[in-house]
Amino acid sequence: MVPVVALVGRPNVGKSTLFNRLTRTRDALVADFPGLTRDRKYGRAEVEGREFICIDTGGIDGTEDGVETRMAEQSLLAIEEADVVLFMVDARAGLMPADEAIAKHLRSREKPTFLVANKTDGLDPDQAVVDFYSLGLGEIYPIAASHGRGVLSLLEHVLLPWMDDVAPQEEVDEDAEYWAQFEAEQNGEEAPEDDFDPQSLPIKLAIVGRPNVGKSTLTNRILGEERVVVYDMPGTTRDSIYIPMERDEREYVLIDTAGVRKRGKITDAVEKFSVIKTLQAIEDANVVLLVIDAREGISDQDLSLLGFILNSGRSLVIVVNKWDGLSQEVKEQVKETLDFRLGFIDFARVHFISALHGSGVGNLFESVREAYDSSTRRVSTAMLTRIMTMAVEDHQPPLVRGRRVKLKYAHTGGYNPPIVVIHGNQVKDLPDSYKRYLMNYFRKSLEVMGTPIRIQFKEGENPYANKRNTLTPTQMRKRKRLMKHIKKSK
């Protein structure tokens, strides 16, 4: 499960500045979700190749009424669901009563908490943070979020220790791997593969969407149609429920973020919406069903969730619910709006259903399996290189400083989403338009549907880079004789 980091503190201590600095590395989508405090933000960030979800909880005002009553309900939820809490204070303003009230609350939660003193630029860090030791939260990490000073040290000392259980990816010699696989394919041999068999694993399916769009109804319709005994399999400490099921002799695991239990236990008309659960479900899923209310249309919140799904690289099926009862004229208007606002998602299937009455629900699984198969499909290095060569023959890369960008070969870089790694010279100078052309060419050639595809470029190493051209003693003597001859001839 992707770790969650919550930024907590008084207003104007620099939480949003640190949030923007952390999430900028991933160019993360920052979204304000209706129904929460207006300044709450969520984003994806990365440290040394390891991803985490970052939450700006907004300002917490610890007044005489008590910090617990002044905290927004969703801010409390974010703290409870976080793996690590970064408690930020203002080093310039000094220790405030609100800081003490917040610290008292955090100590009572027994949550891993680290004290971060911001705005230490221009100050003696040791003197600036001395008063904050009275909060009893241990070591203090001085930073200047606006300039980035101390942020890297903070990440290394706080976040990385909590991610040690995530095994680092092994570095491989990609050139050697390419030629070994290419030679095996040329000789008619099977290229060596690992033990990963996507068809032997259950498909993890997350159903996400805004409150009251019908996620619970759709989940229960799916389970009810299959007449499966529903039991709650422990998922995470954050109360996401993993529900195993089977359909057409294929195993699935529904990731339930709406708190749905057995049919008889559903009493609330409106689903309890947890942004954290939704984001984590997206990260943990293989395929995401994004449910949209046909009667309300596409909202900014729908687009925010969609952006997070795309950034996560997950396979996607768009489900337009509550389709029944709409007039033909309204249906045409909804379809036009979908085409206009979702025109950039040309790889995702769109289904119009009624979860309440069950119409169209059965067809969802065909698209789910198609998306999963596309995202986990094995493609040989030779085939990817051939496709790349055909793309270059159809449309040459542009000239860069008078020289043509050269693409050498391509190989698989990962799955879910499928990643194609292209090696070449000057590839970092390729314009975005040509990168999009290559992505679309690979998608069309591989017939990838239901999942995004990513293209990564790697520059070929120059063995003479950073080396000086020094002459040998023999070359030096020859050069002197040549220079003398040139001078005499003049």
From Swiss-Prot:
Domain annotation KH-like: ranges: 377-461
The entry sums up its family as follows: Belongs to the TRAFAC class TrmE-Era-EngA-EngB-Septin-like GTPase superfamily. EngA (Der) GTPase family.
Query: What's one Pfam family the UniProt record gives for this protein?
Result: KH_dom-like
Question: Which HAMAP family does its entry note?
Answer: GTPase_Der (MF_00195)
Where along this sequence does the record place binding of GTP 2? 209-216, 256-260, 321-324
Organism the protein comes from: Salmonella typhi
Q: What does this protein do?
A: GTPase that plays an essential role in the late steps of ribosome biogenesis.
List, alphabetically, the NCBIfam families matched: GTPase_EngA, small_GTP
InterPro entries registered for this protein in UniProt: G_ENGA, GTP-bd, GTPase_Der, KH_dom-like, KH_dom-like_a/b, P-loop_NTPase, Small_GTP-bd
Q: Which domain of life is it from?
A: Bacteria
Which protein is depicted? Answer: GTPase Der
Molecular function via GO? GTP binding; ribosome binding
Keywords noted in UniProt: GTP-binding, Nucleotide-binding, Repeat, Ribosome biogenesis
The gene designation is: der
Q: Which GO terms describe its biological process?
A: ribosome biogenesis
